[in-house]
Amino acid sequence: MEAKRNQAEGMKNAVAVVKEIAKEFAGVSGREYGLFEEYCMEDAETAVVMIGSAAGTTKDAIDALRAKGEKGGLIKIRLYRPFPAEEIAEALKNVKAVAIMDRAEGYTNHGGPLGSDVMAAMFRARSQAYAVNYIYGLGGRDVRVEDMEKVFADLKQIVADNDAGETYRYLGIRE
């Protein structure tokens, strides 16, 4: 039992260690990497949270939407464990709706692993933002700019309706 408690304490302390090492790396390389990357979050009304390469596609969708005057943003997770819950909740504090993108099925009937973590972080921070979890890219299926534009359109509709509707969704499934 004591060993498991020590592991848990180590995980609590790991975020500070990661931040310290990231500073050292920035000093050597000139590149800064935080716990997550924020893209266009400074004035975002809606946001996507995700891990991985589809963030590039999402940035393209955000750029297209911002050209039309819509304020979307992105949080790309870099450190998943220990999960930076407080930092993520802080980054999302001003959005009205957020889509959490999971590339893995959770088999829980209420969301994928990232969705569960982000929603728990938002709950603990008493966030008033609507949150929906999308499962996408299963089996290696590509996500397209149009897919991410649809996600942002869904978020815009959620804000307009003042209702998240179904919070556990699939993106790009053939029906």
Residue ranges of model-derived segments:
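Conserved active-site and cofactor/substrate-binding residues in soluble primary-metabolism enzymes
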Residues: 9-24, 52-60, 83-86, 109-117, ...
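Solvent-exposed alpha-helices and their adjacent loops that cap or buttress functional pockets
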Residues: 39-43, 90-92, 123-125
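A structural-propensity feature for long, helix-poor, extended segments
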Residues: 88-109
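Conformationally flexible catalytic loops at phosphate/diphosphate-handling active centers
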Residues: 1-37
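Redox- and metal-dependent alpha/beta enzyme cores, enriched for Fe-S-associated oxidoreductases
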Residues: 43-70, 83-90
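Peripheral docking tails and interdomain loops at the edges
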Residues: 103-175
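Short helix-loop-beta junction
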Residues: 20, 28, 60-74, 123-124
